[in-house]
Amino acid sequence: MDIYVKKAIIYQFSPDDTDLYLADKFLNITPKIEEYLRKKIERVYSDEAKTGIFEEDNPFLEMISDDLLETSVAVANRWKEEFIVSENQKTNDLVFIQFSKEGVDHFAFLRIALRETLTHLGGEVDNPIKLTQNNLPGFGTGADEALVINLQSRKYHLIEKRIKYNGTLLNYFSENLLQAQPKISPKKSIKALEKTSQKIAESFNTDDFQFQSKVKSAIFNHIEEENKLSPEKLADDLFDDNLTARLSFIDQVKEAVPEPVTFEEIDASRQLKKFENQKLSLSNGIELIVPNNVYEDAESVEFILNENGTYSILIKNIEDIQSK
């Protein structure tokens, strides 16, 4: 992912007085700071990101201009108006970034909750370990909330967390701040597809380990081969011999997943890793991890239903066995 950080500015929100501490200078983008910000941006393009395209007259989009200082002040104050009702507030850094990705200008807004950390102070003899406040999380940790906008296409990627207000959980970021309705994330979409397929299979008494394995294989194959997952195509794979089940599946998922789940600009590696193997836990305590291509090959693995209702698993053509 070719990302070049141009400018960045950082503000702080304190829950003690619910105030914003605004900066009047941009960050000095040293190599380490550039790496830190770049890694935070890269993590927004994950399977947890909601996506959408802003309308041209969207009020939030209209706040964004080439002047990062002016934009960041406007967005930070609007964010505070919406976030201030949260019942569980922490000290947060608000980071605003102008960057290019593959040569296209982008805007990013990161909310990063600061942490308490134990720090070893080398000069202290009697009490070398102390609790320090307002520490940024490490390089490998994503922002608590993040928005990235392609300024050319108006497409956005959003990582948001719900806040609690009067006992109710609110998607304040998308609904109130952005005034937008993004698609749910690929991760949640796939969970909805899995859950619905299991529900349909149960209603037709076909929800056994073989069906669950079929679901995993189908999801993996579609993502690997097409970089997307269509509910209709998945229904054809899972319920190929049952038209009623196919139609029921499509009907029940259309509200949560009305369109194919796409991985354009989204890192699909976590989903591929999740579904690349079949994991079987047997009643006798044996656990098997079988790659999909091996599991689907009858010359490698065979499941035999015995007359007494038990199963036997025949593993074939093994050239070498190692103990790990």
Predicted region positions:
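C-terminal structured domains
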Residues: 240-324
